[in-house]
């Protein structure tokens, strides 16, 4: 039996990479700064004391962080001997966005520059907006600016409900986001509008169009729902997932994974919202997945609910919850199963602004076929995909080196 379970801890960076200075991220360290805040009592909102991650520490997360940034995360147990192969990887891709991190991990780094809408106000070209209004039969639009997704709902949600005008906004990422009320505007109508935007954005090289449905009746009460949908461009070359699917194996997407890869190489999709549901669905799939399967879960909340919102205590509590569920997974593993833990970028909750941070990510392999060892620094996230491809006997990927060449 050979199955690989990939747990993508979205935004759990473990120290700034050498090129972080290019991004204004020199000194960022998502895990390190959360641990530090916990030890100094600056993350006691709803939780208390030092960061408690016994299972992740046994798997080598803290050791990988120490190797990456030169300092063991405050409050975590440095006396533990890791039971997994652990290391850290730097990013080859030119950006620090979600698709770049995910695609590179699966063997397809993004070596081109995405398009961005850099103007904070009147962010979108008039000809794009005119085409959306005309082809989407819209009464107009709201927003047309950079904004945080929660703040813009408080500002424009009520007007959107009255007027039926969708809210268009962007961020420092290569995204075009559309927020509409699930009930007054309608989910299907929002999805159709996003598909139109995806087509019209082709010449602008924008990575993702994101549907941001919400509910509620007035400012201060609006809440985004779990029906978010991402419309991504396809990866620039075949990925690990395409290789597995082509070989007749299963690629089981949980949460955002299918959206991020534009459904390329996915054989099964399972929706789940929130860390608890994502964990429940992951465990359910591990119980039933066949030989030659990849079960791939994106734990988005670390990034969307805590990293971008710069909520240190929330991020710490979420990590502790994640850690508390790990033993359930380890208890289900069969001989030949491997667990991979990694991240797609950083999003340091003590950093300025609300953007991602350019960081190293953890590279952790665990299973009965994996010799515990220090994997050191990996030159690209693609080493993860190459290692998984080799284990499953798939064709070699264009990028990356096998971290565990002697293990098959």
Curated annotation (Swiss-Prot):
Q: Which molecular function term from Gene Ontology is one that the record holds? A: phosphopentomutase activity
Q: Which EC main class describes this enzyme?
A: isomerase
Q: Which of UniProt's keywords are assigned here?
A: Cytoplasm, Isomerase, Manganese, Metal-binding
Enzyme Commission numbers on file = 5.4.2.7
Name its GO BP terms in alphabetical order: 2-deoxyribose 1-phosphate catabolic process; 5-phosphoribose 1-diphosphate biosynthetic process; metabolic compound salvage; nucleotide metabolic process
Q: Which cofactors are required for activity? A: Mn(2+)
InterPro entries registered for this protein in UniProt: Alkaline_phosphatase_core_sf, DeoB, Metalloenzyme, Phosphopentomutase_DeoB_cap_sf
Cofactor binding, per record: Binds 2 manganese ions.
Query: Per the record, what is one GO cellular component?
Result: cytosol
Its UniProt pathway annotation is: Carbohydrate degradation; 2-deoxy-D-ribose 1-phosphate degradation; D-glyceraldehyde 3-phosphate and acetaldehyde from 2-deoxy-alpha-D-ribose 1-phosphate: step 1/2
Where Mn(2+) 2 binds, per the record, is at 303, 308, 356
Catalytic activity of the protein:
2-deoxy-alpha-D-ribose 1-phosphate = 2-deoxy-D-ribose 5-phosphate; alpha-D-ribose 1-phosphate = D-ribose 5-phosphate
- Specify the domain of life of the species encoding this protein: Bacteria
The cross-references to CDD domains, in alphabetical order and at most eight, read: PPM
Q: Where in the cell is it found?
A: Cytoplasm
Binding of Mn(2+) 1 occurs at 10, 344-345
Regarding protein family, the annotation reads: Belongs to the phosphopentomutase family.
What is the annotated role of this protein in its UniProt record?
Isomerase that catalyzes the conversion of deoxy-ribose 1-phosphate (dRib-1-P) and ribose 1-phosphate (Rib-1-P) to deoxy-ribose 5-phosphate (dRib-5-P) and ribose 5-phosphate (Rib-5-P), respectively.
Q: Which NCBIfam families match?
A: deoB, PRK05362.1
This chain's protein is named Phosphopentomutase
Source organism (scientific name)? Tolumonas auensis (strain DSM 9187 / NBRC 110442 / TA 4)
**Protein's gene:** deoB
